[in-house]
């Protein structure tokens, strides 16, 4: 099949999933074309059947904000025509689903009938898409897609609650390449560079946006380190990083918290970890938690959004109410204080991720592409 993938080219979950999906499809022999404004950060090679098309936005002084949707839809038309694509798979509803609809209409005028698959990832629905400024356009775009998928049952239910959706939403969970985490563990974990041998390692990975509540991460860790010798690795970057670093200084734990910034080596970093902290306001799925579990790391998270579908309470980690820092710290300590308990949680976490392996999820997307291409 010839597939166009439209996504944000960033470290965010939707961009990572879209990029890894495209690379996996190319590995299986499909022809894949990424259409976005920068080369996706996870796209580290181009091949005969894996392509990148940059969306260029011309600056024009009349516009306060440059019209990316127009440039994107025009590029979609160009790539579909030139490479005879059969389906456009757009990740994140805003603005990709709307741009895809415009492209579809323009192509229809040329006698070309492209199919559009829209995958909803979370904040495109819960935080942005439901805003009155965008809601009507997002609802329209979803209803005019040929197929709509969501990354969790919770996100499907939320979408149906917030919008008037006239078509079925298929749930296809996010996935991970479990082999990547196996390789990371086979390489030597240079733990000694980060912590003493008797210290536990806690980790947080995110884009440091307010929804991730990174200050809660610090407060949880502060309680843990008072009970158990430990270090905290903070991976990622974003608007809340400065405030988070300031809180670390105020609590006088700068010697125990390491800020690593953005990284393409998350699998290797997670191989050091014992517990992963994710106290988010909401997670449509919780890809960061799943990645941690694949690296045999127990998860302490909130019980919001799709997280209960990923993190099994009392088995792979624990779930707590939003903002309940004390409960999350207590749960983390209960896992970390005993070697046998920690090992059991780590083994459970690793085992649970097998159902989310790329090889198990990829066929669902292939089936959707085939069915919508065949549908007249």
Predicted feature residues:
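Carbohydrate-associated surface elements
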Residues: 154, 175
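A short helix/loop element that forms part of the nucleotide-sugar donor recognition site in Leloir-type
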Residues: 181-196, 364
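Conserved donor-binding/catalytic core segment of Leloir-type glycosyltransferases
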Residues: 195-212, 218-221
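Aromatic "clamp/platform" in nucleotide-sugar-dependent glycosyltransferases that forms part
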Residues: 262, 281
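A short, well-ordered alpha-helix in the C-terminal region of glycosyltransferases
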Residues: 327, 334, 341-355, 367
């Amino acid at each position: 099949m010839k597939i166009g993938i439209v996504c944000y080219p960033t470290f965010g979950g939707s961009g990572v999933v879209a990029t890894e999906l495209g690379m996996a499809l190319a590995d299986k022999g499909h022809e894949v074309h990424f259409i976005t404004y920068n080369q996706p950060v996870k796209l580290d090679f181009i091949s005969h059947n894996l392509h990148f098309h940059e969306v260029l936005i011309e600056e024009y002084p009349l516009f306060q904000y440059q019209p990316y949707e127009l440039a994107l839809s025009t590029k979609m038309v160009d790539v579909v025509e030139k490479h005879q694509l059969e389906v456009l798979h757009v990740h994140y509803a805003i603005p990709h689903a709307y741009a895809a609809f415009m492209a579809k209409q323009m192509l229809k005028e040329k006698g070309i009938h492209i199919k559009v698959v829209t995958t909803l990832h979370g904040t495109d629905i819960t935080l942005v898409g439901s805003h009155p400024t965008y809601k009507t356009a997002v609802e329209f775009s979803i209803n005019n897609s040929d197929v709509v998928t969501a990354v969790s049952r919770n996100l499907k239910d939320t979408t149906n609650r917030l919008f008037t959706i006239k078509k079925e939403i298929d749930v296809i969970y996010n996935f991970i390449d479990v082999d990547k985490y196996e390789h990371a563990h086979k390489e030597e974990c240079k733990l000694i560079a980060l912590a003493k041998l008797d210290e536990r390692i806690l980790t947080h990975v995110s884009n440091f946006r307010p929804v991730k509540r990174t200050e809660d991460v610090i407060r949880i860790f502060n309680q843990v380190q008072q009970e158990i010798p430990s270090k905290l690795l903070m991976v990622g970057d974003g608007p809340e990083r400065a405030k988070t670093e300031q809180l670390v200084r105020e609590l006088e734990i700068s010697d125990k918290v390491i800020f690593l910034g953005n990284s393409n080596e998350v699998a290797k970093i997670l191989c050091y970890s014992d517990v992963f902290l994710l106290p988010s306001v909401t997670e449509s799925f919780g890809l960061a938690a799943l990645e941690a579990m694949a690296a045999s790391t127990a998860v302490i998270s909130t019980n919001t959004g799709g997280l209960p579908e990923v993190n099994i309470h009392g088995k792979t980690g624990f779930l707590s109410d939003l903002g309940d820092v004390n409960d999350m710290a207590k749960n983390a300590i209960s896992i970390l204080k005993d070697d046998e308990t920690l090992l059991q949680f780590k083994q459970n976490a690793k085992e649970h991720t097998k159902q989310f392996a790329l090889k198990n999820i990829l066929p669902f997307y292939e089936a959707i592409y085939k069915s919508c291409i065949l549908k007249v």
